[in-house]
Amino acid sequence: KIRKVSASDIMTLALKTGEEIQAEVTRQHLSSILAAEGGIERCTLSSLPAVLKAKSRGIEVSRISQHSREKGRPMDSVELEVYAAFKYAAQRQLKMIPSLEEVNETTLRYWAPIIMKKACQSCHGKKGVHISPKTQKLLQKQLSKDQAFDFEEGALMGLWRIKIPKKEIIKSL
């Protein structure tokens, strides 16, 4: 069966797909942190079922931040611009709405804010207040370049970046 699909149809479903993946990854991530004492080893995404399912469809789920846990690849110019827009909204207490961009003819990129939650304070909160000395030592040992702390509850910690192949969206229409 042949069906005409508009760019609007693709973008609408891609935004919905990004929102669903982000919501499920966030749910699984928080559940795994709450289930573990300390949570440090649970703060990785790669083994979460929602991330593995997305990966099997060619969808890449990742996080970016100006305050990274480990020294990784610096943000590119587009990532810096998107991050700056979300940071601007956060500083002015504006609603931060997930967005979708067309990277090229074959790929879409979904962005959404990562907001500091109470469950994250034991590793990302204030040292000596939320982060225990034991956890501080463990973080220093495992993540010597860690900058992802001193966040207040409700603060912008980073962004979800989900790269979605258009063909995956078209298959779903």
PLM region spans:
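Short, cysteine/histidine-rich loop/knuckle motifs that typically chelate Zn2+
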Residues: S122
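Extracytoplasmic c-type cytochrome modules immediately beyond a signal peptide or single-pass transmembrane anchor
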Residues: K1-A119, G128-L173
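Short Cys/His-rich local motifs and their 1-3 flanking residues in nucleic-acid-associated proteins
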Residues: G125
